[in-house]
C-alpha cells in the first residue's frame, strides 16, 4: 500500500508498540509485571505518551520522507 499511495503523497507506516503501562496491565500481579519488565533492556514498561509522540511525528511534515516503514517502540524487547 505504501508504494501504491506514495504517488498521491500519502505515506503509510506501521507502529508496533510493546508492553505499555495501561489499565490492562494493572490487572497483573506485581510478580508477573516484574517478569515482563525484566524482558525489556530499558528496564521499564512504555508509556502511552511515547507511542503517541511517535505517531504524531510520523504524521507530521518532519517525517515527509518516511514511507513504508515499521517502527517497533518496545524498549528493546524485540532486540533482546
Task: Kindly label every feature range from the protein language model.
Residues 3-7, 20, 46, 59:
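A short hydrophobic alpha-helix cap/turn motif
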Residues 26-40:
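A short C-terminal helix-loop "cap" of Rossmann-like NAD(P)-dependent dehydrogenase/epimerase domains
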Residues 56, 67-80:
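Short C-terminal tail/terminal secondary-structure segment
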